[in-house]
C-alpha cells in the first residue's frame, strides 16, 4: 500500500510592536516654567514588574480568549517557556526584533537546540509548533519638559492585557492563538534597560 506523505507546518507571523508616542517640550525663559498638568502624562509610579507573574498573566488571558471561542485551554509548558525567554532575551540584548536571529535561526531551530520535540498530526499535516512575538513598553508615553522626563508608566496588568489585545487584533497572531490543535504553550518575557518589553509565545 502506498504511503501518504505528511505535510509539515511551521507557523510564525510577523512580529508586533506597540509604539510609544513621544513628546518633547523645550523652553528658554528666565523664570522657572510652571508645570501644567495638561501638558504632562498622567502621573503614575514606576511599576514593579515580576516577570514570572507577567508571563502567567499573559498565559491566563490567552486561555480566556480560547475559552471565549469555544476552544480547550492549553497547558503551561516550562520547556517552551525557557525557549521563549531565551529568544526574548536574545532580541533585547542584541537589539533586533524578529522570529529569526541574526544568524538566521527560527523557532524550529530553538526547539531542536533545546531537545524539544513537537509533532501534532491533523489529517495529512504534522504541526511542528508556532511562535508569536511582541514588543511592549514599560510606559505609554513620555513628555520631556526642560530636560526632565515625565513617564506614563504601565501597570503589570496593563502590559499583559495590551500584549494579548495586540496579538488578537493581528490576524496571523490571532490564528496561532486560536488553533484548536495546540495543547501547550510557554511565554517568555525580558525587559530591556530602555523600557522595551520583549515577549515571545511558543506553542505545541
Question: What residue ranges belong to the model's regions?
Answer:
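N-terminal Sec-pathway targeting helices
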Residues: 4-17
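Short, low-complexity, disordered segments immediately C-terminal to signal peptides
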Residues: 33-45
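Low-complexity, Gly/Ser/Thr/Pro-rich intrinsically disordered linker/tail segments
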Residues: 197-204
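N-terminal Sec signal peptide cleavage junction
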Residues: 29-30
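Short, well-ordered surface patches within globular domains
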Residues: 50-117, 174, 180-194
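Short, contiguous strand/loop micro-motifs
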Residues: 48-50, 150
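A well-ordered secondary-structure block
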Residues: 107-193, 197
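Bacterial N-terminal signal peptides
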Residues: 15-25
Amino acid at each position: 500500500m502506498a504511503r501518504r506523505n505528511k505535510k509539515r507546518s511551521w507557523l510564525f507571523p510577523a512580529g508586533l510592536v506597540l509604539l510609544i508616542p513621544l513628546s518633547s517640550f523645550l523652553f528658554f525663559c528666565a523664570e522657572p516654567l510652571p508645570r501644567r498638568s495638561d501638558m504632562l502624562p498622567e502621573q503614575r509610579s514606576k511599576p514593579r514588574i515580576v516577570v514570572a507573574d507577567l508571563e502567567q498573566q499573559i498565559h491566563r488571558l490567552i486561555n480566556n480568549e480560547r475559552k471565549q471561542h469555544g476552544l480547550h485551554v492549553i497547558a503551561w509548558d516550562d520547556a517552551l517557556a525557557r525557549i521563549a525567554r531565551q529568544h526574548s532575551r536574545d532580541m533585547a540584548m542584541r537589539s533586533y526584533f524578529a522570529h529569526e536571529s541574526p544568524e538566521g535561526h527560527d523557532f524550529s531551530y530553538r526547539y531542536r537546540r533545546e531537545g524539544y520535540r513537537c509533532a501534532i498530526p491533523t489529517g495529512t499535516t504534522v504541526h511542528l509548533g508556532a511562535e508569536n512575538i511582541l514588543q511592549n513598553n514599560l510606559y505609554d508615553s513620555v513628555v520631556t519638559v526642560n530636560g526632565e522626563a515625565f513617564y506614563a508608566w504601565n501597570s503589570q496588568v496593563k502590559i499583559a492585557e495590551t500584549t494579548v489585545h495586540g496579538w488578537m487584533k493581528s490576524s496571523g497572531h490571532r490564528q496561532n492563538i486560536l488553533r484548536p490543535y495546540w495543547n501547550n504553550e510557554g511565554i517568555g518575557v525580558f525587559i530591556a534597560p530602555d523600557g522595551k518589553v520583549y515577549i515571545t509565545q511558543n506553542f505545541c
